[in-house]
Amino acid sequence: VSVDCSEYPQPTCTTEHRPVCGSNNETYGNKCNFCNAVVKSNGTLTVSHFGKC
């Protein structure tokens, strides 16, 4: 499972609710929030699965 985060970080994210579970066992509200976290983690954060953790 992977997500293309090449267009991130974004300064603002929508409130769209499409949860993504990260490899840190944290649930992100949507792809934008997840990808911003990936950038902050220098690429160490990955997708565990889609949906809540």
Curated annotation (Swiss-Prot):
It holds the Pfam family Kazal_1. The lineage of its organism: Eukaryota, Metazoa, Chordata, Craniata, Vertebrata. Glycans are attached at residue 42. It is found in: Secreted. SMART domains: KAZAL. This is Ovomucoid. Residues 3-53 form the Kazal-like domain. Disulfide bonds join 5-35, 13-32, 21-53. GO terms for molecular function: serine-type endopeptidase inhibitor activity. Its main location: secreted. Avian ovomucoid consists of three homologous, tandem Kazal family inhibitory domains. The keyword Plastid does not apply. GO terms for cellular component: extracellular space. PANTHER family: OVOMUCOID-LIKE-RELATED, SERINE PEPTIDASE INHIBITOR, KAZAL TYPE 2, TANDEM DUPLICATE 1-RELATED. It comes from the Eukaryota. The record marks 15-16 as: Reactive bond 3. The keyword tRNA-binding does not apply. Keywords: Disulfide bond, Glycoprotein, Protease inhibitor, Repeat, Secreted, Serine protease inhibitor. It comes from Polyplectron bicalcaratum.
